[in-house]
Amino acid sequence: MAEMVARLASERAVVVFTKSGCCMCTAVTTLLGELAVSAAVHELDREPLGKEMERELARRLYGSGGRGGPAVPAVFIGGSLVGSTSKVMAMHLKGELVPMLKNAGALWL
């Protein structure tokens, strides 16, 4: 499963793993859309292996036990895990998100 998540996370400059109906997932994807980022979005509750991918994302976010909070949204920029909602929003407020998106080739501004 780790290889599958890594492959999907590298398919575009920005990849977001979400669940439909998740308000925090909507907040992150809306922010990226407003920044004119065309992210690949994978809704885990609509994927055949979504539960397994969610466990892998939780492991990546919170360590080997995979416990510590929700696994979605999980945001990857340039193939690297950035984090979840709080990390992405904090980076945006500090002015760090746009430069990271530019470096990954997700923005052409």
Curated annotation (Swiss-Prot):
CDD domains: GRX_GRXh_1_2_like (cd03419). Pfam families: Glutaredoxin (PF00462). A motif (Responsive for interaction with TGA factors) lies at residues 106-109. Signal peptide: none annotated. Keywords: Cytoplasm, Disulfide bond, Electron transport, Nucleus, Redox-active center, Transport. Residues 2-108 form the Glutaredoxin domain. Disulfide bonds join 22-25. It is found in: Cytoplasm; Nucleus. GO terms for cellular component: cytoplasm; nucleus. NCBIfam families: GlrX-like_plant (TIGR02189). Has a glutathione-disulfide oxidoreductase activity in the presence of NADPH and glutathione reductase. Reduces low molecular weight disulfides and proteins. Belongs to the glutaredoxin family. CC-type subfamily. This is Glutaredoxin-C13. It comes from Oryza sativa subsp. japonica. The lineage of its organism: Eukaryota, Viridiplantae, Streptophyta, Embryophyta, Tracheophyta.
